[in-house]
Amino acid sequence: MEASWLENRWARPLHLALVFCLALVLMQAVKLYLRRQRLLRDLRPFPGPTAHWLLGHQKFLQEDNMEKLDEIVKEYPCAFPCWVGPFQAFFYIYDPDYAKIFLSRTDPKTQYLHQLMTPFLGRGLLNLDGPRWFQHRCLLTPAFHQDILKPCVDMMAHSVNMMLDKWEKTWTTQETTIEVFEHINLMTLDIIMKCAFGQETNCQINGTYESYVKATFELGEIISSRLYNFWHHHDIIFKLSPKGHCFQELGKVIHQCTEKIIQDRKKTLKDQVNQDDTQTSQNFLDIVLSAQAGDEKAFSDADLRSEVNTFMWAGHDASAASISWLLYCLALNPEHQDRCRTEIRSILGDGSSITWEQLDEIPYTTMCIKETLRLIPPIPSISRELSKPLTLPDGHSLPAGMTVVLSIWGLHHNPAVWKDPKVFDPLRFTKENSEQRHPCAFLPFSSGPRNCIGQQFAMLELKVAIALTLLRFRVAADLTRPPAFSSHTVLRPKHGIYLHLKKLPEC
């Protein structure tokens, strides 16, 4: 009798709990079903490749195969809907007129993508929106003024020559073929540490910050994998997965490096004040620290760490990829490499000194840089979440809430925009050809109010790196080990870039 009474006492609450759980599951299922039906309705006017009912276009997205995207761009020359699983869809665009309308608006960054990046980058320029983004943008813009960038030329040249000295030793003692991306990655990190944070780390020699470089690479892989794996869209499932655990540990490495940079610079500035040794110019970190000192409520410690994280990551990773791909393109096209070298020698001589003004006098080399950025854009896409409906040039509309992805790769390889888009042709960027082209046909640094704040710094770095390298070496591609693309947020070489080096005689 007593057991029966206990069973009856507990049966009702258990039944209620079970019914409640089933109701929650049913509500979630209905919500997902309605979401899918809404997306199907909104995207019905737009043709695209057939998607698997469960996986969507996941296989294509995870193949690191840009050729597949090229095929889609040929077949659908303006845009196409891209499904990530059954309940999430992006709208890809790669037409200049579509891009112009898209970039002229003030839609916020895609929340989901930047939620993935916030745990290790924080809330900096890359993923802020609205008044906070505007405040940070206004604050940081002076850090990229010409007067701040001019002294960076010597620091960049020093870092590049340090890398080239390593190559020269390798050339005299080993085979002439080396993997250059690893070296260039450390070199661009060295440049950022000097120019943006005022620190001499010798990371190219002593291996300092190798853990940071490794962490950024692995984090990029995890973020890209999670973005296109709808099973990992749920935070709890992702955190319980091996990749989720790895993500947390790698984030700690990033934060430790950032905190050390900030504290070291604070100490240096404090010592300078104590010694009455005030520096004449400020770097990126000095400007941010000054802003925080002026109003800690307006610019918190978290804001400070976020901006240092953002600039350190974006400033070295994308630059390293761009320089590596530039060398590879010139290695494949020796006639353009020779013409660049001749131009550089006529301006720089032996390269023992290099100035801001001289870098404005190498137009053909600049055209080769731009053609590389067209052929292999370091940031292959950018995304926004529509805050209000978007009417496209063909008259069709997308509703608020839709995620729109501007595929810069697709735009730069669109045969409706560029003749023979796979051919390396720097003459596309002569003044005459550039004036005849749609202003939104070439967007390596995006455009509009949210364009890349560091694009002038990046171009300066590319010019210094390629000028000094071509003065000392002739490069040729190792055709037995062609590079592959890695579909991170930055378009890096998946297994590095192998080049044959030939030391040139001194002028």
Curated annotation (Swiss-Prot):
Signal peptide: none annotated. Disulfide bonds: none annotated. Heme binds at C452. Expressed at high levels in brain, mainly in neurons in different regions, including brain stem, hippocampus, cortex and cerebellum. Also expressed in cerebral vasculature. Not detected in kidney, nor liver. GO terms for cellular component: endoplasmic reticulum membrane. The chain crosses the membrane at residues 14-34. GO terms for molecular function: anandamide 14,15 epoxidase activity; heme binding; iron ion binding. It is found in: Endoplasmic reticulum membrane; Microsome membrane. PANTHER family: CYTOCHROME P450 4X1-RELATED, CYTOCHROME P450 FAMILY 4. Its cofactor is heme. Its main location: endoplasmic reticulum. SUPFAM superfamilies: Cytochrome P450 (SSF48264). Its EC number is 1.14.14.-. This is Cytochrome P450 4X1. CDD domains: CYP4B-like. Keywords: Endoplasmic reticulum, Heme, Iron, Lipid metabolism, Membrane, Metal-binding, Microsome, Monooxygenase, Oxidoreductase, Transmembrane, Transmembrane helix. It comes from the Eukaryota. A cytochrome P450 monooxygenase that selectively catalyzes the epoxidation of the last double bond of the arachidonoyl moiety of anandamide, potentially modulating endocannabinoid signaling. Has no hydroxylase activity toward various fatty acids, steroids and prostaglandins. Mechanistically, uses molecular oxygen inserting one oxygen atom into a substrate, and reducing the second into a water molecule, with two electrons provided by NADPH via cytochrome P450 reductase (CPR; NADPH-ferrihemoprotein reductase). It is a single-pass membrane protein. It catalyses: N-(5Z,8Z,11Z,14Z-eicosatetraenoyl)-ethanolamine + reduced [NADPH--hemoprotein reductase] + O2 = N-(14,15-epoxy-5Z,8Z,11Z-eicosatrienoyl)-ethanolamine + oxidized [NADPH--hemoprotein reductase] + H2O + H(+). Belongs to the cytochrome P450 family. GO terms for biological process: lipid metabolic process.
